[in-house]
Amino acid sequence: MSTIENFDAHTPMMQQYLKLKAQHPEILLFYRMGDFYELFYDDAKRASQLLDISLTKRGASAGEPIPMAGIPYHAVENYLAKLVNQGESVAICEQIGDPATSKGPVERKVVRIVTPGTISDEALLQERQDNLLAAIWQDSKGFGYATLDISSGRFRLSEPADRETMVAELQRTNPAELLYAEDFAEMSLIEGRRGLRRRPLWEFEIDTARQQLNLQFGTRDLVGFGVENAPRGLCAAGCLLQYAKDTQRTTLPHIRSITMERQQDSIIMDAATRRNLEITQNLAGGAENTLASVLDCTVTPMGSRMLKRWLHMPVRDTRVLLERQQTIGALQDFTAELQPVLRQVGDLERILARLALRTARPRDLARMRHAFQQLPELRAQLENVDSAPVQALREKMGEFAELRDLLERAIIDTPPVLVRDGGVIASGYNEELDEWRALADGATDYLERLEVRERERTGLDTLKVGFNAVHGYYIQISRGQSHLAPINYMRRQTLKNAERYIIPELKEYEDKVLTSKGKALALEKQLYEELFDLLLPHLEALQQSASALAELDVLVNLAERAYTLNYTCPTFIDKPGIRITEGRHPVVEQVLNEPFIANPLNLSPQRRMLIITGPNMGGKSTYMRQTALIALMAYIGSYVPAQKVEIGPIDRIFTRVGAADDLASGRSTFMVEMTETANILHNATEYSLVLMDEIGRGTSTYDGLSLAWACAENLANKIKALTLFATHYFELTQLPEKMEGVANVHLDALEHGDTIAFMHSVQDGAASKSYGLAVAALAGVPKEVIKRARQKLRELESISPNAAATQVDGTQMSLLSVPEETSPAVEALENLDPDSLTPRQALEWIYRLKSLV
């Protein structure tokens, strides 16, 4: 923007704009002018591209035309949504002065800043997904990370010890906006993320952070929150809170506490595991065919968001899990009655956040009233549930009869969208408002009486009394009778076929009515603000109620899913291990047209690793993933898809399943595979569940086999993790003979001619055949290629019998086994030309060959 240098040459209005823009140089400024928000200079050019709106010019200032783009004020939410989705931030500048009394430009100021991580408006948020603002800090000891959901007040911090853990946290939370210090060293960690915001170093100072947080919570120290000894997390939290206050331009009373998230409290899953298990997002980036898509039939948006948080942070405290299990069991007979009532509660959590920010709209208060109206029925239904946790939730949700009564008296049944539209406050709530409204609403009766009286007095049958927005009240007489108008009629407007007049009495009434409308609207706005003052003292109790209602929704939903999908309650045991009878994949069984083949699983300290073999498409990956998903579901307290499950303590879940080139980071498929494998070998423990699928595929046969063997050996002997190890290297099926705690299982298939039928059934022992050519034929590889492959296979088998796919001691040998060393006798015979030998030489060769054998 080439405008600041010649500031004095600009018009007063543009000087005002430039001052405001200088305070917000890096974000778009929406500058209110009448019924439009205008953007100027570079902002206008940028907005025209981002929003696909016209770029025009507005006169000239300082001798140059001003690039300009504008949007109507009533459509601002739609445009803000588009900008926020593209990671943009916008400063909203409103007229706060009165144009009638202003000398020079009307006074304006920025009233709020809309950023991707601090939005609370319903139109800008995805209702079933958390919208997080995050801050990241790093020093020599590790990372500090804080997140805030401003639409609920949920404030969390953590201190990831290393880069891998930090990557996993970023993927788990997926913030809409991320604040980082200007000297942040690990830029490769956050590059390419949406909503990145560079902040000055002083915003991350620990003393400033403590002061900010104590001021927010009204405390002297942070010991009560359990975060006192988390300096790196506090640095991030302090910056985050300051940014939230700067953008909202108001107090944040709904942010009442901060919670420390500790690694030892939940099952840790790295970024690769979250991606491969498709918990809330599938591998293509969508939400279809994910674990959440099967489990989430919650009836409130806040319940849906809570369930997704549970899925991404499975808890390790079995007391919490047993309580959830018991609650789900107790609720199974009540889901049909509870869910329709819960559905009416809506998104109370986010409504309360808007109330706290004083941005709640009339329909928010109407929805809050509707939520309160459901509480008596909910409480009555829950009274019959024989469960201490359910009764605790019932008490926590409260009843709020006084607030319900207040909103029933104060707000009409179906209020308009905005307070400025008027007609929000119900009749009978305020006597003065009723009087002003009566004066304004009584105009119709008065005009009808005036019309009758004036017709009789003047004898003019074409006389009418009316009103329009431009000229106000008038008396209209047709052109043919206008010459008979009384002398006290003052002409106001001439039409083609009529004249319009005003009389002193009508003018006086007009002033009174217009004044009454203005006063009624002003009083209505005042009463609406007073409603906030009456509701906000109850904010803490209301937030507890919303949290209880969301949790009830999640538990009722899990009870309904358990009953509908035939899930069973898992049993927690003290020793490491997983025993599953008739286990099923929760997602695959829902998308299959035929019945899902259930399979058993047995992992224990004596049987720590399963080597899984079988054909591609046989179901190895499904079997492995279903084990991890059953474990994950058990550790959120849910019932699971199996006939019976016993599960021991788990600290981490790792998956090394499939890979693609990471082109952005310049890493090959094999490099990605080895990086993920290294992470597992460094961090897995005897309490970890590890899924390893096809390790070593991305390199040469011998390198790959050697790596796979060494990894399996390390996991089984040194780490002793519970491991499912799928492989095409049949040499690995010898591992059970060489070490304890390892067993072979395989997924079977039947081959008939050129066709193959996958049984999807897990059997003990190693696979007998790879079925590679049959799978290739099934995939549509041309017949001549399959035919040539069969010829080549026979050729290889005949050349090197040891390399053939034959069964040796119950173990299938690799097609590419190392050939045995050729004997000297064979080498000598190969170099011999029998036609050139004399009888004596032939006899000598017989003795020589005899000595070589």
From Swiss-Prot:
Which is a GO BP term held by this UniProt record? mismatch repair
Report which gene this protein is encoded by.
mutS
> What name does the UniProt record give this protein?
DNA mismatch repair protein MutS
Its function? This protein is involved in the repair of mismatches in DNA. It is possible that it carries out the mismatch recognition step. This protein has a weak ATPase activity.
Task: Kindly give the PROSITE patterns that the UniProt entry links to this protein.
Answer: DNA_MISMATCH_REPAIR_2
Task: Provide the residue positions that the database annotates as binding ATP.
Answer: G614, P615, N616, M617, G618, G619, K620, S621
Does the entry feature the keyword Transcription, yes or no? no
Which is one GO molecular function term here?
A: ATP binding
The UniProt record lists the keyword rRNA processing:
no
- Cited HAMAP family: MutS
User: Which keywords, in A-to-Z order, does the entry hold?
Assistant: ATP-binding, DNA damage, DNA repair, DNA-binding, Nucleotide-binding
Classification via InterPro entries = DNA_mismatch_repair_MutS (IPR005748), DNA_mismatch_repair_MutS-lik_N (IPR007695), DNA_mismatch_repair_MutS/MSH (IPR017261), DNA_mismatch_repair_MutS_C (IPR000432), DNA_mismatch_repair_MutS_clamp (IPR007861), DNA_mismatch_repair_MutS_core (IPR007696), DNA_mismatch_repair_MutS_N (IPR016151), DNA_mismatch_repair_MutS_sf (IPR036187)
